[in-house]
A protein has these predicted regions:
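Short, basic/aromatic recognition patches that contact phosphate-bearing ligands
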Residues: 1-84
């Protein structure tokens, strides 16, 4: 992030994963194509990043899951199980 709190585009895997995690944790919807365009990478690269985050959540926060929502056109973090 820069001083104004905006994400600057960097193209490391860690930067992408942190960017994706931030969007999802804040309740946003992640569009794979837009994210790929933003970072100048392929959708497959973003899919691998999502898979990495899925593994992270499965190990550290099993009540949270990254799901695709076709109505919203992207991926979101489902934490409905954490409400029980």
């Amino acid at each position: 992030m820069n001083r104004e709190g905006e994400w600057t585009v960097r193209n490391s895997r860690l930067d992408r994963i942190l960017y994706i995690q931030q969007i999802l944790v804040q309740g946003g919807v992640l569009n794979k194509q837009q994210t790929a365009d933003h970072f100048g990478v392929s959708e497959k690269t973003i899919q691998r990043d999502l898979d990495t985050l899925r593994s992270y959540f499965a190990d550290s926060e099993p009540r949270r899951e990254i799901l695709y929502n076709s109505a919203k056109g992207g991926y979101l973090l489902d934490d409905t199980l954490s409400r029980f």
